[in-house]
Design a protein with these regions (language model features):
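Repeated scaffold domains used in trafficking and secretory/extracellular systems
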Residues: 1-7, 39-49, 75-85, 115-125, ...
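Conserved beta-propeller blade signature
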Residues: 12-16, 52-55, 88-92, 128-132, ...
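Short loop/turn segments immediately following the C-termini of beta-strands
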Residues: 17-20, 57-58, 93-95, 133-135, ...
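A short loop-to-beta-strand structural motif that recurs across blades of beta-propeller domains
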Residues: 22-24, 59-61, 97-99, 137-139
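Short loop/turn segments that connect beta-strands within beta-propeller blades
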Residues: 26-31, 63-68, 102-106, 142-146
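A short beta-strand motif characteristic of beta-propeller blades
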Residues: 31-37, 68-74, 107-113, 147-154
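Loop/turn-rich, solvent-exposed surfaces of beta-rich toroidal or solenoidal domains
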Residues: 76-134
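Blade-level signature of beta-propeller repeat domains, shared across WD40, Kelch, NHL, RCC1
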Residues: 132-176
Length: 177
């Protein structure tokens, strides 16, 4: 079944399966669907501001809906991922870090260390990158301050790998009315 899901700027549904399954697209207007084999195993997934679909794990994979082709790169990721609307995809790093990936080249731009492994990644409307552990802490990373971060403690069994701030809705479009 579908594990990760997102909506593109045209309101179409995208879903990915856990590990190396299939990417699914459902057209919002016709409800017709298409599937493609995933190019690499994926855990997290997102649709970026340019309409590319990403699956994230140890390998980052970018799907181009126009050409129906994949590009991949091994980046040492692990869990969730999200794009900032400015050309950087942030993802969970496998070694207690948050990895910044260039969305054009798929190359690692930099890696920001955090105190423990974070599984969930999200970006808020102020541009802060959030990482959530699977335990009791979340970190708010300020990329404009060389990766300085604040720790938010006292969480109980925190778990997410998806958009926890609502920022990904910026890629969907403006509401009508």
């Amino acid at each position: 079944g579908i594990y990760g899901a997102a909506v593109d700027k045209d309101g179409n549904f995208w879903g990915s399966q856990l590990s190396q399954g299939y990417l699914v697209n459902i057209n919002r207007q016709t409800l017709q669907y298409k599937t493609w084999p995933m190019a690499a195993g994926g855990y997290g997934m997102t649709v970026d501001s340019k309409g590319y679909v990403w699956t994230c794990s140890s390998t980052v994979a970018r799907f181009d809906p126009m050409t129906e082709t994949w590009q991949t790169n091994s980046v040492g990721g692990s869990g969730g991922c999200m794009e900032d609307g400015k050309g950087t995809l942030y993802m969970s790093g496998s070694n207690s870090s948050i990895i910044a990936v260039d969305t054009d080249t798929l190359q690692v731009k930099t890696s920001y260390p955090v105190p423990q492994y974070v599984h969930g990644i999200s970006i808020d409307f102020y541009g802060y990158v959030w990482g959530v552990s699977m335990g009791s802490e979340a970190y708010r990373l300020d990329i404009n301050q060389n990766g300085a971060f604040q720790t938010f403690a006292g969480l109980v069994g925190a778990y997410t790998y998806s958009d926890m701030t609502g920022f990904a809705l910026s890629n969907v479009g403006q509401p009508c009315g």
